[in-house]
């Protein structure tokens, strides 16, 4: 086990940073050192922003997005098309699509995908609320913006069957989403093209 290079408070900071996606122990040490060097300009404001976020973040009961209000900012936006619902696996996918600027509809976050390997079944996902939202009279289209993985496509097929009795068109993202690809890692142009060229599922 590597020897501690600083007091327990700094070591704890490094350990917590190392848990972040994309940060290993080395990167976490560099990030911690940068935060410490810029304590007033970076560390203190970051700590305050994290404290406030921890206290105020809620999950939107309408769509499953995270925000500091319920309903969330997107659900409260009356300029969005209420007749189209974009279904995503996770909030990170919602954020990725928002960055593309191609979506003017509303979202629905499933909170995962069906996975026999991970034991994720339909009752573990936000599916009953999806059926409720897709059943409203003004709903015309449900866009399945799910990752092009085996589990993502299995979930897409399940949702298509789940909504088959409703008078809504079910579509999926088109060109630009590679097989095995995840939305959060795609650039805005690719996502924008995928939304515009969606096809019936």
UniProtKB/Swiss-Prot annotation:
Domain of life: Bacteria
Protein name: Recombination protein RecR
Domain annotation Toprim: ranges: 83-178
Family label: Belongs to the RecR family.
SUPFAM superfamilies: Recombination protein RecR (SSF111304)
Keywords from the named record: DNA damage, DNA recombination, DNA repair, Metal-binding, Zinc, Zinc-finger
GO molecular function: DNA binding; zinc ion binding
Cited PROSITE patterns: RECR (PS01300), TOPRIM (PS50880)
Function: May play a role in DNA repair. It seems to be involved in an RecBC-independent recombinational process of DNA repair. It may act with RecF and RecO.
Zinc finger regions, C4-type: 60-75
PANTHER family per UniProt: RECOMBINATION PROTEIN RECR
One GO process term, biological-process aspect: DNA repair
